Amino acid sequence: MAQTVQNVTLSLTLPITCHICLGKVRQPVICINNHVFCSICIDLWLKNNSQCPACRVPITPENPCKEIIGGTSESEPMLSHTVRKHLRKTRLELLHKEYEDEIDCLQKEVEELKSKNLSLESQIKTILDPLTLVQGNQNEDKHLVTDNPSKINPETVAEWKKKLRTANEIYEKVKDDVDKLKEANKKLKLENGGLVRENLRLKAEVDNRSPQKFGRFAVAALQSKVEQYERETNRLKKALERSDKYIEELESQVAQLKNSSEEKEAMNSICQTALSADGKGSKGSEEDVVSKNQGDSARKQPGSSTSSSSHLAKPSSSRLCDTSSARQESTSKADLNCSKNKDLYQEQVEVMLDVTDTSMDTYLEREWGNKPSDCVPYKDEELYDLPAPCTPLSLSCLQLSTPENRESSVVQAGGSKKHSNHLRKLVFDDFCDSSNVSNKDSSEDDISRSENEKKSECFSSPKTGFWDCCSTSYAQNLDFESSEGNTIANSVGEISSKLSEKSGLCLSKRLNSIRSFEMNRTRTSSEASMDAAYLDKISELDSMMSESDNSKSPCNNGFKSLDLDGLSKSSQGSEFLEEPDKLEEKTELNLSKGSLTNDQLENGSEWKPTSFFLLSPSDQEMNEDFSLHSSSCPVTNEIKPPSCLFQTEFSQGILLSSSHRLFEDQRFGSSLFKMSSEMHSLHNHLQSPWSTSFVPEKRNKNVNQSTKRKIQSSLSSASPSKATKS
């Protein structure tokens, strides 16, 4: 039966069209996969191919295409009408039975599903609403009771009520517990969130506080410090090496200076023995010249003086050794020319040369501290301790400020002579002449030592005691000394013809040596940079203060005329080289005019101001005050307080000379009194631009009538910055 149903279903569900001709199927044929073809079409296809045209399944005799029985075919008309009727009837009956069976099965399934649905609905109701369930149960019980009143007992009802009560109580308790648990759950959730946040915070704090976080930064900082310390140590090592080299150089220079000093002492002893005879022969002639020219020098100058005092020339052997000998010998020379008792003064000078263990400052305090009446302080006097570079410009100037310099203009205008009652100490603005400066000049002393020893014979005075004590190491600064000798008009004695001829020859040789020495003088780059920085800083203040002083000072008018006199004398240098006889005569005339009287020299207890002018070739005047004091008592052979007041005006060119030259010029000034103005003008003409010329003081009244000056003006006039710029 089932097989017939499948066949019927198959025949009814076959496609109507053929896969090959795409037309209505005639005599349907199927392959293994139930693909329908027309029998004619499939026969034609199988002639060329052995596969199904739809699924490509091989069609072989073992698996041929099958014909469908009962399908629409051309053979149907061959059956009779009755046969076809019975076929249709049987076919419909089969379909009817099949459908009826299927309907019955479906009805059974629906009933089962309904019963299952009802049971599920009842379960849902009991779960969601137990009261309804109880009520439903009661209703059922009632129905049962009503239905079966004889079967229900009151005991069972009471039991069910008790159970119901207990169930309700349990339900209420469980409900309360659930609410409490919900609240506790909420609290726990909040606490959990707080703890999570606290945990995160603690983790972050631990990360921040961990020493490993900043470990690499600390290591880098320590490494940088170590590198910095290494660089510092290397720099200090280099500095120590440089200092060691410098110390070795200084020690070598000290050894050279010791050797040179020993040689100088030997040469001085030789010169002393050689010149003793000439000094005795010229003693009488010097005293005659002194008495002859006493009146002229007294009128032209309010007072005359010599070089620095003997008691000021006692520095220690470790500092200013060359300067000490220079100033001591200058003092001995000046006092020897002005004193009558030569032997007594010569012994005094020997004592001065032996005493070298007392510094200048302590000695000045000892000498001047014993005279409180003379040492009157002045309110305008100040000490300026300027930083001096390690150059020959360290000692810039000497200054002496006394009330007499400011008050004597009124007295001297009326022609009266007022003697000073105020004794002032020397003011050293840049007195930093230490062993460094002496070591720098030691090479210069060694270079010119041989020439200086020859020069001592040319410029020596007839008095032997003076030149015996003079050191020749500073004769190299003749460019400044010769010009100074032209202005200081207090030398005594005459020059013999032999000495004048020797002086002319030695002067020409000395000028050439000095020029070559000045040109070969070099300075290191470090010293030059220090000087440049030092000079540039002071140049501005110096220019402003010098302009204000030059505009106010009445001495400016007298400077130009004196400078013209010095320049006019420079043109006479050629005559000096060609006519040595005329040179001797002019030298004697100049010395006779500038000599001092014995009365003025013996008056050692009084102060007499004397003015000197140093004018630069560029006619730029600057003013600087300082005093050099020296006096000696020929009777008691004791060193007395100074008896002379020097007021010296420095120009720009003088400040370019080394710090030693300032004292060397003072030493050699008295020995060079014998040189004529033509010799100095020629010397200045041949010298380097740094050298200057001295011009005698002819307008002393104009200088003394100047108003009170400030200490700043003296600093500006002696500033090394302007001298360098000039």
Curated annotation (Swiss-Prot):
GO CC terms of this entry: chromatin
Modified-residue entries (Phosphoserine), positions: S210, S526, S553, S561, S568, S570, S719, S721
Record field: catalytic activity: S-ubiquitinyl-[E2 ubiquitin-conjugating enzyme]-L-cysteine + [acceptor protein]-L-lysine = [E2 ubiquitin-conjugating enzyme]-L-cysteine + N(6)-ubiquitinyl-[acceptor protein]-L-lysine
Low complexity compositional bias, start-end: 304-318, 713-726
Biased composition (Polar residues): 319-334, 589-602
EC code(s) of this entry: 2.3.2.27
Any one GO biological process: regulation of DNA replication
Key words of the record: Chromosome, Coiled coil, Metal-binding, Phosphoprotein, Transferase, Ubl conjugation, Ubl conjugation pathway, Zinc, Zinc-finger
Zinc finger (RING-type): 18-56
Region (Disordered) location: 276-334, 436-460, 570-602, 687-726
Subcellular location: Chromosome
Bias (Basic and acidic residues): 280-290, 446-457, 579-588
Pfam families: zf-C3HC4_2
Record PTM: Auto-ubiquitinated.
SUPFAM superfamilies registered for this protein in UniProt: RING/U-box
Origin superkingdom: Eukaryota
Coiled-coil intervals, chain numbering: 87-129, 155-270
Subunit field text: Associates with ORC complex. Binds to chromatin; association is cell cycle-regulated, absent from mitotic chromosomes, is associated with chromatin from G1 and partially released from chromatin from mid S-phase.
Function, in words: E3 ubiquitin ligase essential for DNA replication origin activation during S phase. Acts as a replication origin selector which selects the origins to be fired and catalyzes the multi-mono-ubiquitination of a subset of chromatin-bound ORC3 and ORC5 during S-phase.
UniProt name for this protein: ORC ubiquitin ligase 1
Source organism per UniProt: Homo sapiens
Gene that specifies this protein: OBI1
